[in-house]
Amino acid sequence: QDTIREARITSDRASAVAKTQTGHKRLDKLDFIYGNVVFSSPDIIKSLQNLPGVSAGTELMSGLYVHGGEGSDNLFLLDGVPMYQISHLGGLFSSFNTDVVGGLDFYKSGFPARYGGRMSSVVDVSTRDGDFEEFHGSFMIGLIDGRLQFEGPIIKGKTSFNVALRRSWMDAVLAPTTAYLNKKNEDGEIIGGNYVFYDLNASLTHRFSAKDKLSLKMYYGRDRLGLSETYPETEEAIVGNGISITASGEDELETDIKWGNLICSLNWDHTINEDIDIRTIAYYTGSYADVWYRWKDWQFETKEIEIYDALNETNISKVSDIAATTDLDWRLDGNNRLRMGASYQHHIYNPSRNSAIDNDGSLLETSSGKRYTGDEFALYAEDEVSIGKLLNLNAGMRYVIFSVPGKFRHRLEPRLAMSFRCSDNVDIKASYTHMNQFAHLISTNYLDVPTNCWLPSTENIAPMHSKQVAAGVYSRLPMDFRLNVEAYYKTMDNLLEYSGSNTLFPPLDSWETSFHKGKGRA
């Protein structure tokens, strides 16, 4: 029996907001496949780095610095759920597997009121449901990783699944390489190295009717880096009567770093009628980083005594959200589209550090850290309206409440965007946005490394906020070319910069007093 695969049609009405907003870019699967490729694998973040107003930071890394902001100022959403860690291999690969990605919306200005929580940009990534009619999949091998994807119906026309797994295979190369180098090393030094990353995307979708759909989605990503070095040492000690004795020992250095993400969400899409849709999401999102290292310095004193100094330290950073959101999309008529919604997030920040120093048999153990919690509640409304044939407006307001023990804050965030059609081929656009950010990425360096940790605005640390004005001319040229010229002015307040001594790990007990507060303009 011949079958025709499902056809997907995107209406012009559904993209109305994209026509009004400044600084907006919509990317689909073909943009990733034929866009930037890293070691033969498509990469979402690398594709965004080529856009005007976006900087990559360190060469080849997955940094995203938008309109003068930091990498931590960007809101990354996977099917409406925030992600805190968005890269593998220290930033060389992004955490988004393009085998399951359906498309994304990227905003660097003109943010609609439905988005909030970060100052500089929004990367809203959506994944595909599984095929409801037939089974199919793909298998790809890259220079550093391999990808496997499979989807299909469980109950034809009703229930489907979509599963994708990506894994690096660098560990298969590192093990024999280090073994060969150790064999060739004549001074007895032994080195060890191992690195692996993998991520899993899975979704299960059931259609109860033409008006109700329930989806269970999961993402799990993990990196692990292990390094070790053993140095042989030979030392001489005088034991009496001028007699010297020679003994051999080893100095040791070992590091184990693990970091990753876990996202679980339950999505309910309900259609009230042909003009009103409601989406409700309940989710858990969490990110963790665990950095452990051990160092031992062997020394020989006398015939009977061998001593050593040793350090064993563990640094753990965890952040997680338990949250729910609901959004209503009401198409009042062909010229007016109203969106409104509410969200609640319970944030948990849990950084800790434990160290043990053994100095010639004298053990000194220390620990530091604190558990922080915060509650964030938001309401928003935005109206997309066409006034005649030439003018489109998107006006919205977002109200945010953020509460931590000892401090209650609330903010209004006005949003306004407009588009005026000068001719069939030329549009003028302008926007104003006000954003607040209540989460701070605490770092003692400028790299995206697992030693950084997320902490909330507290009684003593105010939230960051930005105001941005943008305007531009957007023109359509012959042969489907586009020429866009856009300018922006952005101010940022309550920015944090580490003011302590050079160290790899940020201070946990005194972090609120270890940073300078400043302002920024771009």
Annotate the PLM regions.
Residues 1-36, 45, 71:
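Short, acidic, small-residue-rich periplasmic hinge/interaction motif at the N-terminus
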Residues 127-129, 143-145, 154-156, 167-171, ...:
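Transmembrane beta-strands of outer-membrane beta-barrel pores
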Residues 75, 103-112, 120-128, 135-187, ...:
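Predominantly transmembrane beta-strands of Gram-negative outer membrane beta-barrel pores used
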Residues 62, 119-121, 135-137, 144-148, ...:
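Hydrophobic, lipid-facing positions within transmembrane beta-strands of outer-membrane proteins
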Residues 321-325, 367-372, 378, 458, ...:
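Outer membrane beta-barrel strand-and-loop segments of large Gram-negative receptors
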Residues 205-223, 253-407, 421-424, 481-485:
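Face-selective signature of the C-terminal outer-membrane beta-barrel domain
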Residues 34-36, 81-107:
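Short acidic/polar hinge/loop motifs at secondary-structure boundaries
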Residues 39-40, 45-82:
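Extracytoplasmic beta-strand/coil segments of soluble accessory domains associated
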